[in-house]
Design a protein with these regions (language model features):
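Conserved beta-strand elements of the Class I
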Residues: 25, 193-195
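Thiamine diphosphate
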Residues: 1-161, 166-167, 175-177
């Protein structure tokens, strides 16, 4: 079964779409490697912005680009994107209703040995508390691809949390039912209802 990190899936679909859509922009805060965005930066240098370790600038620049008609995807570790640049995410992106997609990479404790400074237990709750900000946690590469394609057309503030490690496929390329802001039924039953998302999807599904 195919296993790649969802962050890699994001890069792949953005690279595919950026060939035709020159308004797609990727911004990183010294995190292109961690975000798996190095191939995008190498192949589309005019559509890539490196802000350095400056998360507030990352988000504000993204909002400004969106106001100019661009489609920015701002990538940074979830632990910093949801704390250091929280005011900018709230005011410049969500309250201003700008077309910015924030991508929090290596969410939860997936940074492992880097320790508590890089862990993010708060990002989902923090971003969900901001009016106008939608929060997404795709389960595998196929769902991630559909989500990015939908967000390119949707043009509303969004936050995506992805993990660091490869995840097994839940869906297939030909069978990935996807509807924006709607849950997907994976298995039918009568005894119990189980709701799950993100990286726990494959693990939970194996028990049902």
């Amino acid at each position: 079964m195919n296993k790649i990190p969802n962050r890699q899936a994001i890069c792949e679909v953005l690279m595919d779409k950026a060939k035709e859509d020159k308004d797609i922009m990727v911004l990183c805060s010294d995190s292109r490697g961690s975000a798996s965005m190095t191939p995008f930066a190498d192949n589309f240098p005019d559509q890539f912005v490196e802000t350095g370790i400056a998360e507030q600038n990352l988000v504000s620049i993204s909002a400004g680009l969106a106001k100019c008609g661009k489609k920015p995807f701002a990538c940074s570790p979830a632990c910093f994107l949801s704390t250091r640049s929280y005011e900018q995410a709230k005011v410049d992106v969500a309250y201003s209703n700008t077309n910015v997609t924030l991508i929090g990479i290596s969410g939860g404790i997936s940074y492992g040995a880097l320790g508590m400074s890089h862990h993010s237990a708060q990002d989902i709750a923090a971003m969900s508390a901001i009016p106008n900000m939608r929060v997404y946690l795709p389960s595998d590469r196929h769902q991630t691809k559909h989500l990015i394609e939908a967000l390119l057309k949707d043009e509303k503030p969004s936050y995506i949390r992805v993990g660091r490690n490869p995840v097994e496929d839940i869906y297939t390329e030909d069978n990935c039912p996807f509807e924006m802001d709607k849950a997907t039924v994976l298995k039918e039953g009568t005894d119990v209802a189980v709701s799950y998302t993100h990286l726990r999807a494959h693990e939970t599904d194996s028990y049902l």
